[in-house]
Design a protein with these regions (language model features):
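N-terminal targeting or regulatory segments adjacent to alpha/beta-hydrolase or S9 domains
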Residues: 1-55, 321-326, 371, 399, ...
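N-terminal cap/lid segment of alpha/beta-hydrolase-fold proteins
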Residues: 35-80, 321-346
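Short beta-strand element of the alpha/beta-hydrolase
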Residues: 72-76, 82-93, 347-356
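Cap/lid segment of the alpha/beta-hydrolase catalytic domain
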Residues: 97, 102-106, 110-157, 356-362, ...
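Gly/Ser-rich "nucleophile elbow"/oxyanion-hole loop immediately N-terminal to the catalytic nucleophile
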Residues: 138-182, 386-404, 409
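Hydrolase active-site cap/lid region
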Residues: 191-238, 413, 417-447, 452
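Short beta-strand/loop motif that positions the catalytic acidic residue
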Residues: 261, 267-269, 273, 444, ...
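C-terminal catalytic histidine-bearing segment of alpha/beta-hydrolase fold enzymes
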Residues: 275, 282-327, 471-501
Length: 501
């Protein structure tokens, strides 16, 4: 177990272990010459072949400096006039988040451009050309050749270019192009804002890609940083050349970019992080000399932090009142039930969100407002049971014309047993728990969208097969190599399913 911290005071004096190379600025000035005045050849194509009332969804692609075709998701709210735009960068080694997740920004009139990093989990492919091992990740992909051929140098140049792409888009306010991300995404937002001094705001959460020597010394050289351990074991087992490697990696250390940021910054540190060391997160924060505000999250590791998400839209739009439509911790009269509520005047549809694992907040729920739904989210309580869900559903049926229930784990099981009501239009269920005789207890016959998970320890292949056989009115997707987690594909299927109801 890595060290867990209780406050920023314990890490505030953290310093970098490697100095910025003397020729760092010269190196990057040379790299930027490769991307100046190139033909971006920007292309847009409709992403989903159906109409959404409040947002347009596109796949965008452009040519990078070496002929690589870089792919992005582009979302634009259907509003008049120019909009601000967020450059949203994803974590390692994933892909841009689902359209549904990104659409939370568009509910408040913000466009989004989300790049897929080359050679990772999205649509952008890596053309190769780097010299070095590739077995354990991008940190060592190119480490044995010229540093300018390292894959992260190429990704950083793509990051520079995606800002240039954003400036070319119609109806975007060029003065309000901002950047955001967590982990690798935070690192790329730092790089983007450092190379484009005109960027005025960035939001960062537990940045990756920094102080590789300290990461190694603290034994965080696994998971995201596993390439460091692999390289040491197989190419330098006695460690005699490690300092040379760390000196080389300093050219892609985001702490060396952080001092070049002019933007206003909000910065989140996860004090129990087991992937991106809190000490390293703190040392990156110290390098930022522009206007900055720190948020620390005690007890949080490398995970979704909803409280940080809720700071994004008010920060970018400079209006702290923008979450005033979110009503947390509301007690439902006579039911002894507490809920979080996000609602919009005039909505006659409601989405009831039931998740025993995590308490989502306003940023997450804004995507449902886009589709015309108010949201009620049950605050988790170990004493809640099937009767709790049934009573809450009956309460909402008295307030709204249409109800959709989105439920996970045991709440998904409970939902199948809810008393049927014609106002319940659909169920969206993920992570059902195997339960004996559940199919004899099902009361509800509305439309159902269900995801089953191939490596979920709480269910079996036989149970998943019975779901397909026994449930009617079912749209069903099976994800054989997923456990209980967020699935981009299923998120966008939720969006389309809700839009068609």
């Amino acid at each position: 177990m890595k060290k867990i911290y209780n406050s920023f005071n314990e890490i505030k004096d953290a310093n970098k272990s490697i100095n910025k190379p003397l020729d760092f600025d010269k190196f990057w000035a040379k790299q930027l010459e490769k991307v100046k005045n190139i033909d971006l050849n920007i292309k847009l194509e409709k992403a989903i072949d159906e109409n959404f009332e409040k947002v347009e969804l596109y796949y965008l692609s452009f040519d990078s400096f070496d002929g690589t075709r870089v792919y992005c998701k582009y979302l634009r709210p259907k509003v008049d006039g120019n909009t601000p735009l967020i450059l949203q960068f994803h974590g390692y080694p994933g892909a841009s988040r689902s359209f549904f997740e990104l659409s939370s920004y568009t509910q408040k009139g913000i466009s989004v451009l989300a790049m897929d990093c080359r050679g990772q989990g999205g649509r952008t492919l890596d053309k190769g050309g780097s010299i070095g091992p590739t077995v354990c990740g991008h940190l060592i992909n190119g480490l044995l050749g010229d540093m300018e051929d390292h894959i992260y140098v190429k990704i950083f140049l793509d990051t520079y270019l995606v800002y240039e792409v954003a400036k070319e888009l119609e109806d975007i306010d060029e003065d309000r192009i901002y950047a955001s991300g967590s982990s690798q995404g935070a690192a790329l937002a730092i790089v983007c804002a450092s190379l484009h001094k005109e960027i005025k705001k960035i939001a960062l959460l537990y940045p990756f890609l920094s102080d590789y020597k300290k990461v190694f010394e603290l034994e965080y050289d696994e998971i995201a940083y596993e390439g460091l351990r692999y390289y040491s074991r197989w190419f330098d087992p006695t460690g005699e050349n490690l300092d040379k490697i760390f000196d080389k990696l300093a050219y892609i250390d985001v702490s060396n970019f952080a001092g070049g940021i002019n933007a206003d910054v909000i910065y989140g540190i996860s004090l129990a992080d087991q992937v991106c060391p809190p000490l390293v997160q703190a040392s990156v924060y110290k390098q930022i000399s522009s206007n900055k505000k720190l948020y620390t999250f005690k007890g949080f590791g490398y995970e979704k932090i909803c409280s940080m998400e809720d700071k994004l839209i008010p920060f970018f739009l400079e209006d702290e009142s923008l979450n005033s439509d979110y009503l947390p911790n509301i007690e439902i009269e006579n039911l002894n039930i507490k809920v979080n509520i996000l609602r919009h005047m005039g909505h006659r549809k409601c989405l009831l969100y039931l998740n025993p694992s995590i308490e989502m907040k306003s940023f997450y729920f804004r995507r449902f407002l886009n589709l015309g739904y108010d949201v009620y989210s049950l605050i988790c309580n170990k004493n809640y049971n099937e009767d709790t869900i049934d009573n809450l559903v009956k309460y909402l049926c008295n307030k709204y014309d249409d109800i959709v229930i989105m439920a996970y784990r045991e709440f998904a099981n409970y939902t199948l047993k809810v008393t049927s009501n014609k106002k319940i239009k659909a169920l969206i269920l993920q992570g059902l728990i195997e339960e004996k005789d559940i199919f004899n207890k099902i009361n509800i016959s509305c439309k159902k969208l269900i995801a089953t998970l191939g490596i979920d320890e709480m269910t079996s292949e036989d149970f998943n097969g019975q779901l397909l056989e026994k449930l009617d009115n079912l749209e069903y997707y099976h994800y054989p190599r997923y456990m209980y987690e967020r699935i981009n594909d299923f998120e966008d299927r939720k969006m389309q399913f809700l839009n068609k109801l």
